[in-house]
């Protein structure tokens, strides 16, 4: 996992919990270790029974501010069928 996500792990998880997220996994270039300076951060999330009123927009905005990069979040249910197996195989729990 790229240092950016690793060093900010606790803050990412804190923000996620505040928005009702119960699990966070990193996938894509950050998980593979081939992220470049312009790479975004792809997060596979599990949402609890009571997400915040500002979910998911508030979570994404706060994570982008924290990480200084574009952030995309998706749930397993929201994964495209063509990408599902690859994403699940490379996803690394935070």
Region locations from a protein language model:
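Catalytic core of pol beta-like nucleotidyltransferases
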Residues: 1-23, 31-37, 48-94
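Conserved histidines in hydrophobic membrane contexts and catalytic metal-binding motifs
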Residues: 26
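A short, structured beta-strand/loop element
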Residues: 37-38, 43
């Amino acid at each position: 996992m790229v240092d950016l996500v690793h060093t900010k792990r606790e803050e990412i998880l804190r923000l996620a919990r505040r928005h009702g997220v119960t699990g966070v996994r990193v996938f894509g270039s950050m998980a593979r270790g081939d992220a470049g300076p312009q790479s975004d951060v792809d997060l596979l999330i599990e949402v609890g029974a009571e997400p915040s009123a500002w979910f998911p927009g508030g979570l994404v905005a706060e994570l982008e501010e924290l990480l200084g990069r574009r952030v995309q979040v998706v749930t397993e249910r929201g994964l495209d069928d063509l990408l599902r197996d690859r994403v699940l195989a490379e996803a690394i729990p935070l």
